[in-house]
Design a protein with these regions (language model features):
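Flexible, membrane-facing loop/turn or short amphipathic-helix motifs
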Residues: 46-56, 114-121, 148-158
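One face of beta-strands
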Residues: 37-41, 62-68, 109, 139-145, ...
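C-terminal region of N-terminal signal peptides and the immediate post-cleavage residues
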Residues: 3, 7-10, 19-38
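Edge beta-strand at a domain terminus
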Residues: 142-172
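Internal, hydrophobic beta-strand segments that form the core of beta-sheet-rich folds
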Residues: 124-150
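Predominantly extracellular/secreted and cell-surface proteins with exposed
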Residues: 56-128
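Tryptophan-anchored aromatic micro-motifs
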Residues: 31-56, 85, 141-145
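A short, structured loop/turn motif at beta-sheet edges
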Residues: 30-36, 69-76, 98-104, 131-141, ...
Length: 172
């Protein structure tokens, strides 16, 4: 094969790959980078797994409605929870934001984990959490809330499924 043919074949292959990537669903992910309006968030604590003893402690699923507003004005798309509920302890951050990474909404935070001990005591263990939610059909986002509890009685990991479902407006 001549040198010109090889160059043409490589160029054609690169162009085809570029078109395939450009037309792939991931290329349309930018369209999914808006997370606005009211959503029902479900943290499936009753389905949690992990290496921490906290993963084996029984809990119920936690559900709450939140309203989100997205902005891409800084070149990075961010969605913010409007008027978030009060933090359950003083160690939790008040502002809640997720950043769009091209395929998922991601939130990372340093926090403390409320580790229940015998006798009704609670130990506040240092932890790092990351939540990653992927847009799916009908505007539903699904993902995992992953926490690494760095030290203390609950040291280890906890993973729980999380979902965000759009709240439909009432039908009149």
């Amino acid at each position: 094969m001549s040198g010109h043919r090889k160059i043409a074949l490589v160029a054609l292959g690169a162009a085809s790959l570029g078109c395939a990537v450009w037309l792939s669903p991931a290329a349309f992910a930018g369209q999914a980078s808006s997370w606005d309006g009211p959503y029902l968030l479900t943290f499936a604590a009753n389905q949690k797994t992990g290496t921490s003893m906290a993963a084996r402690q029984p809990e119920t699923a936690q559900r709450a409605s939140y309203s989100f507003t997205s902005s891409c004005s800084t070149g990075v798309c961010v969605t913010t929870v409007n008027d978030p509920p009060a933090a359950k302890n003083q160690y939790m951050q008040r502002s809640v934001q997720y950043a769009w990474n091209g395929s998922q909404w991601v939130q990372q935070m340093n926090r403390t984990w409320d580790c229940p001990l015998l006798g009704g005591l609670v130990e506040h263990d240092p932890a790092r959490s990351i939540t990653a939610l992927t847009p799916g059909p009908n505007g539903v986002l699904t993902g995992v809330f992953h926490t690494e509890i760095v030290s203390g009685a609950c040291k280890g990991t906890v993973d729980m499924p999380v979902s965000a479902t759009p709240v439909s407006p009432p039908i009149i």
